[in-house]
From Swiss-Prot:
A lipid is attached at C31 (N-palmitoyl cysteine). InterPro entries: BMP_lipoprotein, PnrA-like. It is a lipid-anchor. This is Uncharacterized lipoprotein MG040. It comes from Mycoplasma genitalium (strain ATCC 33530 / DSM 19775 / NCTC 10195 / G37) (Mycoplasmoides genitalium). Coiled coil: none annotated. GO terms for cellular component: plasma membrane.
């Protein structure tokens, strides 16, 4: 996972390495396999340990290139796992280890005849900042690469890079770079909702005590938890959005799905929630709110500490990740979201070893498709889903972002909300660049299914909710009638008023929105809004440490909350002219 979020550096920079000789290094850098492809666009993977067919970061970015050529030129590029695709044969390269290595690789790709380099991962930033800087040591590289375009994936270029004591390492003018970072919190909001639905639809399985400690006190509850490798803005963003998705399910959707646990003395018949929604086959267990559980033994009170929710590294052998997984299994947690890179595999392994009825929610890419995903223990008891330990994931759709930026550069105008050179773009729910993986579509329910939303295109979501509040009790539906992303209109295609669009509106602040929290009228209140007015669910970034309910305690112990931009931002000073794409060939062929 990238450690750079929306232009805010959250990782320790590597030591600065002089690379004035990088032009010479072009001739000294190993070129890998013999070139057999001539492509206008090449992929540069994150580091020298990365590969192309990783079913993750590299492959998703490459799929964006493939999709662009297919849609724009009708040309089929080889699939990522094709034996034809060797490193260095014209479609992808590894970057090397040092700053000078990376810049040399840029020049190698340019010398291959490629016009655009898709550079993936936060660790590409230093070299990109260098070749667009005013630093005299990199002027030859800046001139050499001035007519080469770059797409920086999962990061953002800064005008002043790596400031220390007020002095930047580089002052950059990225006239030939278009970058994209991702609102992963918005995407994981959708995943939180889908997780709550998934657990409820499979109550019989998840309320089974298999694999739990006999000391578990959560025997009749549906519970979730998660942890990060290190508490950084980029990782806490995932955790925050996921928790808010659970909160929206608990505080808003819940009211319209079941009346089993409502107080009938305080709720009139006309206000009672929809008949028997999300109940298991025996008709007895109604929908449940989802409770958050701390990995620390004995700490499930009103306040929990973020330090208990971090393993301390992103290592694939981190022992604390194993400890956290086992503590959560002991507590009977039904779903865990590990935001710690390869430590997802460690959690899956512990669940399989203990035959626990616990799901793992994937992160970044569709991890349910990876080889690490195996059959869930007693899988036949799961009524819905893929019957694997990882049912679905919270994703960054790198393929969508890469294809959109390539299309923008080719056409010379914004495509899918993405801008070209000189812009830091943002992947959002609105432009289909973050969200839940396709395997989770059957659990991503319409967030306002009880409302008449036919007029949502003409008004904000919150205004539509207000306008339809009086008739909401008349729109009762059985579960089979509640639209999901999978079954809406018999299609998964996104449209102007589809379920994804409704979530995008829900997560976008408007002038007519009311505050999500009671705290807007009483600063001492810190509860999620639970009144009939469903409120403003725009994610600010610090909700982990501010807002709570009886099921979702406040997190303490961190100030590393992210700040967000919500749309593409021009990072060029006035008067700077972006690089021209008129000479780009936009072609691909096998030699």
């Amino acid at each position: 996972m990238g450690k750079l979020l929306f232009g805010k550096l959250v990782f320790k920079k590597s030591l600065f390495l002089l690379s004035g000789m990088s032009s010479l290094a072009v001739f000294l850098t190993a070129c890998g396999a013999t070139k057999i492809f001539d492509s206008s666009v090449q992929l540069l993977v994150s580091d020298n340990f990365s590969t192309l067919a990783d079913k993750s970061f590299s492959q998703m970015s490459y799929e964006g290139i493939r999709s662009f050529f297919k849609k724009s030129k009708g040309v089929d590029l080889p699939e990522a796992d094709s034996s034809q695709l060797q490193e260095g044969n014209g479609l992808w390269k590894r970057p090397g280890f040092t700053l000078s290595d990376r810049i040399a690789t840029f020049n190698n790709i340019k010398n291959d005849g490629s016009d655009v380099i898709v550079a993936t991962g936060f660790n590409q930033q230093e070299s990109l900042q260098a070749i667009t800087s005013d630093d005299i040591r990199f002027q030859s590289d800046k001139e050499s690469l001035a007519k080469t375009g770059f797409i920086f994936v999962d990061g953002a270029i800064e005008k002043e890079f790596n400031k220390r004591n007020g002095v930047p390492q580089f002052k950059s003018t990225p006239t030939n770079i278009s970058s994209v970072a991702f609102r992963s919190d918005d995407g994981s909001f959708l995943t939180g909702v889908a997780t709550a639905v998934y657990l409820n639809l499979n109550q019989e399985y998840f309320l089974d005590k298999s694999g739990w400690s006999t000391n578990s006190s959560n025997n009749n509850e549906l519970t979730v938890s998660g942890f990060v490798g290190i508490a950084l803005p980029s990782t806490l963003s995932f955790l925050n959005g996921f928790r808010l998705g659970i909160a929206y399910f608990n505080e808003v959707i819940y009211k319209h799905l079941s009346d089993a646990q409502d107080s009938s003395a305080q709720v009139t018949t006309s206000k009672q929630t929809v008949l028997k929604q999300l109940q298991v086959a025996n008709g007895e267990k109604r929908i449940k709110k989802i409770k958050w559980i701390s990995p620390k033994q004995g700490s499930d009170g009103e306040t929990i500490n973020i330090q208990d929710h971090q393993s301390g590294s992103f290592s694939d052998t981190e022992p604390r990740a194993i400890t956290i997984a086992n503590n959560l299994i002991d507590k009977g947690v039904n779903a865990i979201i590990p935001i710690a890179g390869p430590q997802t595999n460690l959690v899956v392994t512990q669940i399989a070893r203990r035959q626990a009825h616990t799901a793992v929610i994937g992160v970044d890419s569709a991890q349910e498709l990876l080889d690490i995903n195996i059959d869930a223990p007693n899988k036949d008891k799961l009524k819905m889903g893929n019957k694997k330990i990882i049912p679905f994931s919270s994703i960054k759709a790198l393929d969508v972002a890469v294809e959109s930026i390539l299309s923008t550069l080719e056409k010379g105008s914004s495509q899918n909300g993405y801008q070209g050179f000189g812009y830091n773009n943002i992947g959002t729910v609105k432009n289909n660049s973050v969200g839940v993986s396709e395997a989770g579509y059957e659990f991503l329910i319409d967030p306002v299914f009880w409302k008449n939303t036919s007029s949502m295109q003409a008004m904000s979501l919150s205004a539509s909710l207000k306008a339809n509040a009086a008739s909401s009790s008349d729109n009762k539906k059985k579960l089979s009638e509640v639209a999901t992303k999978k079954n809406e209109n018999g299609s998964t295609k996104n449209g102007s008023n589809d379920i994804i669009d409704k979530y995008a509106k829900l997560l976008t602040k408007s002038s007519s929105s009311t505050s999500m929290r009671n705290g807007s009228s009483d600063s001492n209140q810190q509860n999620f809004k639970t009144t009939d007015n469903d409120g403003d669910w725009t994610i600010v970034g610090d909700e982990l440490g501010k807002y709570k309910s009886s099921e979702l305690p406040i997190f303490t112990g961190s100030s590393s909350y992210p700040t967000f931009q919500t749309e593409a931002q021009n990072v060029l000073d006035g008067g700077a002219n972006v690089a021209s794409t008129q000479g780009f060939k936009w072609s691909f062929k096998q030699i």
